[in-house]
């Protein structure tokens, strides 16, 4: 149970692919102009990670070490092609919006990295959980960045959600403030870099505060009964 918890915590927070490893920055910065685009690519990446980790882990005993990387790439490319066709069939608007970044998941360092570092060494169930956790960690980072950029740039949230979730999702669109022209700095790549930098700083501050609290709690437990840390 502790190993399962550790895999989840590592994927979502401690070893977050976007905020700690800084992998997959090209789609992270390019696609997150809206919350819908960010969520769509994040979920597609999560599905690819989960399925490829599961497949590679299942076949790990029959995969020759000398040619494992080409085999991994073939498996990843097959899964990405299937996911791309699903998005094309059921979310064509999102497919057009994401464009080349869907097939580029094949070359995403996150996917290949987890295949080599985790799936090739662990069992199928734990590998699938690792892929799902890593994918959801990246999705959360993309969604937060996309939401911030969309709110600051257009004053809206979930604009175009119907492209991802269907026509009913039009009701999810929220206009936070009205603007006649978008704030281009937030919508263009410089805004993505600034937003990512602020998110990295925020995660660092949260980690430092949590580390300080753990140190204080450990110090209090180490004191004899009835004593305090104050002089």
UniProtKB/Swiss-Prot annotation:
The chain crosses the membrane at residues 18-38, 39-59, 63-83, 86-106, 125-145, 182-202. It is a multi-pass membrane protein. Keywords: Cell inner membrane, Cell membrane, Electron transport, Membrane, Translocase, Transmembrane, Transmembrane helix, Transport. Its EC number is 7.-.-.-. Coiled coil: none annotated. It is found in: Cell inner membrane. Part of a membrane-bound complex that couples electron transfer with translocation of ions across the membrane. Required to maintain the reduced state of SoxR. Belongs to the NqrDE/RnfAE family. The complex is composed of six subunits: RsxA, RsxB, RsxC, RsxD, RsxE and RsxG. PANTHER family: ELECTRON TRANSPORT COMPLEX PROTEIN RNFE, ION-TRANSLOCATING OXIDOREDUCTASE COMPLEX SUBUNIT E. This is Ion-translocating oxidoreductase complex subunit E. The gene is rsxE.
């Amino acid at each position: 149970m502790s190993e399962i918890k550790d895999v989840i915590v590592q994927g979502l927070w401690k070893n977050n692919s976007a905020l700690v490893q800084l992998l997959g920055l090209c789609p992270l910065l390019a696609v997150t102009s809206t919350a819908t685009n960010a969520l769509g690519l994040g979920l597609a990446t999560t599905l690819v990670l989960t399925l490829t980790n599961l497949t590679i882990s299942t076949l790990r005993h029959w995969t020759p070490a000398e040619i494992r990387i080409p085999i991994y790439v073939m498996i990843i490319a097959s899964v990405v092609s299937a996911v791309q066709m699903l998005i094309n069939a059921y979310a064509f608007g999102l497919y057009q919006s994401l464009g080349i970044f869907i097939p580029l998941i094949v070359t995403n360092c996150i996917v290949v990295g987890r295949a080599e570092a985790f799936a090739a060494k662990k069992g199928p169930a734990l590998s699938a959980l690792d892929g799902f956790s890593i994918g959801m960690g990246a999705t959360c980072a993309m969604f937060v960045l996309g939401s911030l950029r969309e709110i600051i740039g257009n004053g809206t949230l979930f604009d175009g959600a119907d492209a991802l979730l269907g026509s009913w999702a039009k009701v999810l669109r929220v206009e936070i403030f009205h603007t006649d022209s978008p704030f281009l700095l937030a919508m263009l790549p410089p805004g993505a870099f600034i937003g990512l930098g602020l998110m990295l700083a925020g995660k660092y501050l949260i980690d430092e505060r949590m580390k300080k609290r753990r140190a204080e709690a450990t110090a209090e437990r180490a004191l004899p009964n009835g004593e305090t840390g104050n002089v």
